[in-house]
Amino acid sequence: MVRGPVAELRAFIDAALVRPVAAPQPDPPAALLRRRLVVAVSLVIGAAVLAWALRIRPGDALFYAATLALAAVWALGAVLSGRLRLGLGHTRRGARQRPVVQSLALGGLLLAVFLVGALVVARVPVLREPVDDLLDHARFGSLPVVLGITVLNGVAEELYFRGALYAALPKHAVAVTTVLYALTTVGSGIPLLVLAAAVVGLVTALQRRVTGGILGPVITHITWSAGMLLLLPPVLDLVR
């Protein structure tokens, strides 16, 4: 039976973000306590480093060091917190496998939505200027280096927020990880960055709940973030 595009989209959303593959596997009490302590310390340090990194002047080489330090905080906190699972996703045939293709599609869909929204943002100077300032790090720096750091940070953030932090929360993990992820960007002073973090955080948290692991969220995040870095500047330039 051939389904229409709307039915296909509904089935995709259900498989990617709604219907869990398997029941979660909680940590033993001692391991959970350790995870929570490591996660709490890492969150405070990471939020401070992120606020510092986003306030560094575009073109300053210190930005690279700061963002690499941030990736190290998230990744180290995640690894030290305990075991992290890759997770499994649903396939079109009802089987289970690593959610690679599904996550690439989800990241691409998320990217498309943001790029359409950027056409609106570009027409509002008070919203556009902070975004331009953030993108100046790529314009005035080395794009390949910034792209590499962007991917690295995306992986590290997912290891921490949808890996360690999610596993440390017994209840409401989707809501709490989304809110905390968004709050870490408040120090940037860029409202649209906070909004983007909330949306991406919610999507990847739902994906974490469905797949039971970090692989899907990692692929979705880096597909979106790398795409935004490469495609957002030319999209904004369309309406200059």
Where do the PLM segments sit?
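Juxtamembrane helix-loop-helix connectors linking adjacent transmembrane helices
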Residues: L86-N153, L238-V239
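N-terminal, membrane-interfacial amphipathic/helix-forming hydrophobic leader that caps
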Residues: M1-R98, L229-R240
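Residue-level signal for alpha-helical transmembrane segments in multi-pass membrane proteins
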Residues: V49-W52, A65-A66, V73-S81, A112, ...
